From Swiss-Prot:
This protein binds specifically to 23S rRNA. The globular domain of the protein is located near the polypeptide exit tunnel on the outside of the subunit, while an extended beta-hairpin is found that lines the wall of the exit tunnel in the center of the 70S ribosome. The lineage of its organism: Eukaryota, Viridiplantae, Streptophyta, Embryophyta, Tracheophyta. This is Large ribosomal subunit protein uL22c. Gene3D superfamilies: Ribosomal protein L22/L17. InterPro entries: Ribosomal_uL22 (IPR001063), Ribosomal_uL22_bac/chlpt-type (IPR005727), Ribosomal_uL22_bac/org-type (IPR047867), Ribosomal_uL22_CS (IPR018260), Ribosomal_uL22_sf (IPR036394). The gene is rpl22. Part of the 50S ribosomal subunit. It is found in: Plastid, Chloroplast. GO terms for biological process: translation.
Length: 142
């Protein structure tokens, strides 16, 4: 049996962006592309994608990496986006004046974006442990 041994207990660093003025559905379209990728690959993807949601997500990933290097001392090349989620925020409601004294409501949705980066150097060391309770294989039993 192969098990993983962790060196440090805290390997995750996060950045949270709240009340970003964009639809959660449009931000999820970009977030789904970067989930599980390395930090450098994520920055490259976000710079080349043509969506408006890329810039605030780029700033959050960059901020999370700065938190990892400054607060925890992690190397930026070994960071991976382990968790990236988008939640709906409050809706900003306005009224648009129209003809003959009428008004139409305008709803501007907001979203909350959470980016979690994890250090992968912790999982470099593997430990092989043998199960002491098994007598061998399936064919040893009578």
């Amino acid at each position: 049996m192969i098990s993983k041994r962790k060196k440090k207990s805290d390997t995750k660093v996060y950045a949270l962006g709240q009340h970003i003025r964009m639809s959660a559905h449009k931000a999820r379209r970009v977030i789904d592309q970067i989930r599980g990728r390395s930090y450098e690959e994520t920055l490259m993807i976000l710079e080349l994608m043509p969506y408006r949601a890329c810039y605030p997500i780029f700033k959050l990933v960059y901020s999370a990496a700065a938190n990892a290097s400054h607060n925890m001392g992690f190397n930026e090349t070994s960071l991976v986006v382990s968790k990236a989620e988008v939640n709906e925020g409050t809706t900003v409601k306005k009224f648009k004046p129209r003809a003959r004294g009428r008004s139409y409501p305008i709803k501007r949705p907001t979203c909350h974006i959470t980016i979690v980066l994890e250090d992968t150097t912790v999982y470099d060391e593997y430990v092989i442990s043998h199960d002491t309770y098994s007598s061998g294989g399936l064919w040893d039993k009578k």
